[in-house]
Amino acid sequence: MIEIDNLTKRFGDRTVLDDISLSVGAGEILAVVGPSGAGKSTLSRCVSFLERPTSGSVRVDGADFTRLEGDALIAARRKIGVIFQTAPLLRRRTVAQNVALPLEYLRATDDSVSRRVTELLDRVGLRDRSGYHPAQLSGGQRQRVGIARALALGPSVLLSDEATSGLDPATTKSILALLSHLREDFGLSIILITHEMEVVREIADSVARIDDGRIVESGSVTDVILDPTSALARELLPERPSVPVRGDAEVWEVSHASRHVPLDWLTSIQSVPGISGVQVDVLSASVEAIRGVAVGRAVLAISPAAPPGFADHLSARGLHVTSTAATARKTAA
């Protein structure tokens, strides 16, 4: 488990991180997102103690890194494995030799190194590439070697700093599946620093958005997405292109605000007394499963004569309804 409490980092008079507090339990994945320059990379360096925070604490399995110095800090940092955007592999070393590097620094026995390297290459699906050199590997395979090396010393926390950036979609998906399996197998606490919202949707249990060095929004991924007021939810579920509105219809945006929205919420309108005559046109809609919960958003064109009970009916079924000005969305007939 990793706990970050009131972490602040300053460079001279400039505050880059301001009072950051986050926690990730064993077997959990937290995604940290935000625009370029928001402080994500500095947070990564402070968590791994490549940079010492100005104030606050970073505790891993109860050990407060900010209270440690010298050899004690070096030993404690072994509890955090780091995966970088580009795996920094030594080109003259084989795959197995690259994975073995941290163990060799600790002067582990040859037998223990061999066993550990074989186990890790099995885990990342590269045992048959153990004698290859980095130049003989694909980008995804090199990243798998980096993951294996990050796990060599048996960390309890894995920090991924834009590890899937630049990979093609299929390779990204396979790397995320690997990380998900590893967190289950080893009980890892994983922090994903990323700008890719599909990564958050695919694998994260919780998410925090940093902007200008501060956390502006955080929570479980499903809770964030089901919050109709969340700006982060709109990034996680971007709007789909809509069919233009014609005539004098009113535009409503309908989004899931509950884990229990019935699948027939739209078709059921036709059977509700006093509402069945409402003309409803679907301009756009999307539904997907995230962490086992169906979430979605639809843009509807509603006839002007829609009774107040129509919105109440949708709200009662776990939906959030926002009426927007139709004029901006209309096109000439």
Swiss-Prot record:
Among InterPro entries, the record links this protein to: AAA+_ATPase, ABC_transporter-like_ATP-bd, ABC_transporter-like_CS, MetN_ABC_transporter-like, P-loop_NTPase
**Acyltransferase listed as a keyword:** no
* Residues annotated for ATP binding in this entry: G34, P35, S36, G37, A38, G39, K40, S41
**Which PROSITE patterns would you find in this protein's record?**
ABC_TRANSPORTER_1, ABC_TRANSPORTER_2, METN
Protein name (record): Methionine import ATP-binding protein MetN
User: EC no.?
Assistant: 7.4.2.11
Q: What is its main location?
A: membrane
Outline the subunit composition.
The complex is composed of two ATP-binding proteins (MetN), two transmembrane proteins (MetI) and a solute-binding protein (MetQ).
So what does this thing catalyse? L-methionine(out) + ATP + H2O = L-methionine(in) + ADP + phosphate + H(+); D-methionine(out) + ATP + H2O = D-methionine(in) + ADP + phosphate + H(+)
Q: Which organism is it from?
A: Mycobacterium sp. (strain MCS)
Q: What does this protein do?
A: Part of the ABC transporter complex MetNIQ involved in methionine import. Responsible for energy coupling to the transport system.
GO CC entries: plasma membrane
This protein's membrane topology, according to the annotation, is: Peripheral membrane protein
